[in-house]
Amino acid sequence: GLIAMMDPPREESRLAVEECRRAGIRPIMITGDHKITAAAIAKRIGILKEESEACEGAVIEDMSDEELQDFVEGISVYARVSPEHKIRIVRAWQEKGNIVAMTGDGVNDAPALKQANIGVAMGVTGSEVAKDAAAMVLTDDNFATIVKAVENGRNLYQHIKNAIQFLLSGNFGAILVVLCASVAGLPVPFAPVHLLFINLLTDSLPAIALGVEPHSKAVMEQRPRPMSESILTKPYLLSIATEGVSIGVMTMAAFLIGYTSQNAALASTMAFGTLCMSLWAMGRIGAAEASPNGKQ
């Protein structure tokens, strides 16, 4: 007689792989199984495409590190690999300037998990050696959980940037107003109680709100950031400066309009009110951009 057995991939695996590709993440299969088996599973979940190939570990055995770096670009499935092969594949992608996350569950995966930028071990079926070598342990052994972690991380990073931009823009605008008034020999636009109110309420609460905005799926349509990229990029700083100058100009204009009546208290009140309303409007714009239905 004939007995056939099948261990099919999880239904959510294909969706997770597709989401990885949209996010600029390339999934690669490295397995000890036969090449035909590995290729069949990889095609089923979308890892192996027409533009990529499958190979066995023996193919890279005699390759130099430089040759391997060129070779890995066209390979999406590696079969019959040894622990040494896994390390070399991970290192080849790292030397090409990529962040590499490696998943594994066995003792033979431990060296590659340690070599990868992010080692991910299986929490249910994984060995203790693999868990010790990994930086992260999956409690449900589900690849989709890794994709969800990437989405959460990108959203958290975007929320932090939104909060920083809000705080720096508002404070930059207030500093410009005080500086311009001092240079022009005008009275100080803000009373101490105004500054206290701005720092405790007008700045803090909207910044906190921006930091806890609902997550957006739009972040998974973006390409990964370069490793060397600072959080304070030139476009980001330009945006902060533009918003700060706009706030400063509007606040200073309100102060000068009030000061034409020779009433310093009125001028200060108008400047304070304009600054608060500007910060409120900027917070609402930031919240709209960070919302699930807005742009990131």
State what each model feature region is:
Residues 1-32, 36, 63-66, 257-271:
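Signature of the cytosolic headpiece of P-type E1-E2 ATPases
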Residues 9, 112-113, 130:
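PDZ/PDZ-like domain micro-motif
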Residues 21, 43, 182:
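Short polybasic/polar patches that bind polyanions
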Residues 14-16, 34-45, 84-89, 106-116:
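Acidic, divalent-metal-coordinating active-site segment for phosphoryl/phosphodiester hydrolysis
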Residues 49-101, 116, 121-294:
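Membrane-embedded transport module
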